[in-house]
Structures are given as structure tokens and as C-alpha cells.
Amino acid sequence: MGVGKSKLDKCPLSWHKKDSVDADQDGHESDSKNSEEACLRGFVEQSSGSEPPTGEQDQPEAKGAGPEEQDEEEFLKFVILHAEDDTDEALRVQDLLQNDFGIRPGIVFAEMPCGRLHLQNLDDAVNGSAWTILLLTENFLRDTWCNFQFYTSLMNSVSRQHKYNSVIPMRPLNSPLPRERTPLALQTINALEEESQGFSTQVERIFRESVFERQQSIWKETRSVSQKQFIA
């Protein structure tokens, strides 16, 4: 699944307000019941939408929803997984990669849609992007959720051939996690060092357009198959 273009999805709920009906104190009880029934019928019709007896209107609405959903989903270049206290640092790295190196679009995990399960957001973030960047800071080891994130990302890169070498540990300039304290599973992967003199060269070698296009193609094919199975 892809990830939405906007950083934070705004999903206002349209709550239909029921017009208050003033009951006539001197009226009969039957009139009051009739008024309530009429009000309830109007509320149900307004909430569900009045549909014509034929199915002519249903099909255009279904067709119109497809392109809109496709526009909202986009395969990303990268996602940055980070500790909760490192959101600002993650945003700085995102800005660095997008504006200084032209690697876009990218997203940080804190920008994933609200109101959804963390696991669903994690799955969408990892599978909806070409590279998964693990922001290795001092806060990384203190956050249990970060440990789960990097183990899940590594398992995903191993189990799916096209995601091989897609997990990129990165030590940023601010409060980087020392190598000796880095989890053993991540020590086996060559990390992206922002303070290194070869940082720019590393970035160019990692984020290659050919790799992105290949993963994007597989992502589109997977989505197409899933949509066909859902319709069937």
C-alpha cells in the first residue's frame, strides 16, 4: 500500500445535524410521535443519501472514487523510522535528503496518518517506499517501538527479494548512537554516516533511480493484483 501525499491526512467527519422539532405542548401524543417518525426518516435519508431506484447512479460514483484514491497514494523514495523524541531530527534529515540531494518524495514516521494502528502505518511505510531509513540516535535504544521497527524492517528486507538492501541505518549529526552500542543485527549493515566526508557519495550510491523504479513497478503490480482480488 502506498502512503498519502500529504504529511498529515485531515479527515473531517461530516456529522449531519438533525433539525430540532418543537413539540406542541397542547398537541396530541399521536401528533408528537408522527413528528418524531418523520424527523427520524429525514435523518436516515440524509445520512444514507437518497438513491434512485435504478443502479445508474451507483456506477459513476464507484468510477469516480478510483482515480481519487490513486491520486492520494504515491510510492515514496524513503521513510524515516525514528524515536518519538527525535521527530525534529527526522524532519531535518528529511529536508536534507529532499532539498539538498533531490531525493523526493520522502516521509517521516511521525507524519503517517492518525487514527490507524501503528502496525498498519508501519506496514504501509515500509512497503510503500523504496528505502527504510533507521535514525540511529541515543533515543533509539530507549524506545521499545524502535526496536520493533528495525526488526520488522530487517525481516521484510530478507523475506522479500526486491526489498533486499533497502534498510539503511543512519547516524545523524545530532546525538548519533555510538557503534559499540548499536544492536548487533544493525552492526552487520554499513550505516550512512552524516558526519563522514563521504556522506554525499554514499547517498548517491544508495538512492539510485533504477532501484526506485524497479521497486515502484513491483509495488504497482502488487496493488493491481490486490485490487482485482478484492473486487472478485
From Swiss-Prot:
GO biological process, one term: defense response to virus
Regions of compositional bias (Basic and acidic residues) in chain numbering: 1-39
Signal sequence range: none
Gene3D superfamilies: Toll/interleukin-1 receptor homology (TIR) domain
Alphabetized InterPro entries for the sequence: TCAM1/2 (IPR046946), TIR_dom (IPR000157), Toll_tir_struct_dom_sf (IPR035897)
Cellular component, GO annotation: cell projection; early endosome; endoplasmic reticulum; endosome; Golgi apparatus; interleukin-1 receptor complex; late endosome; phagocytic cup
Residues linked to a lipid group, N-myristoyl glycine type: G2
Keywords, in A-Z order: Cell membrane, Cell projection, Cytoplasm, Endoplasmic reticulum, Endosome, Golgi apparatus, Immunity, Inflammatory response, Innate immunity, Lipoprotein, Membrane, Myristate, Phosphoprotein
Molecular function as annotated in GO: interleukin-1 receptor binding; phospholipid binding; protein heterodimerization activity
Positions of post-translational Phosphotyrosine modification: Y164
SUPFAM superfamilies named among the record's database cross-references: Toll/Interleukin receptor TIR domain
Post-translational modification: Myristoylated. Required for membrane association which is critical for its ability to initiate efficient signaling.
Chain's role: Functions as a sorting adapter in different signaling pathways to facilitate downstream signaling leading to type I interferon induction. In TLR4 signaling, physically bridges TLR4 and TICAM1 and functionally transmits signal to TICAM1 in early endosomes after endocytosis of TLR4. In TLR2 signaling, physically bridges TLR2 and MYD88 and is required for the TLR2-dependent movement of MYD88 to endosomes following ligand engagement. Involved in IL-18 signaling and is proposed to function as a sorting adapter for MYD88 in IL-18 signaling during adaptive immune response.
Record text about domains: The TIR domain mediates the interaction with TRAF6 and MYD88.
Protein name: TIR domain-containing adapter molecule 2
Name of the gene encoding the protein in the UniProt record: Ticam2
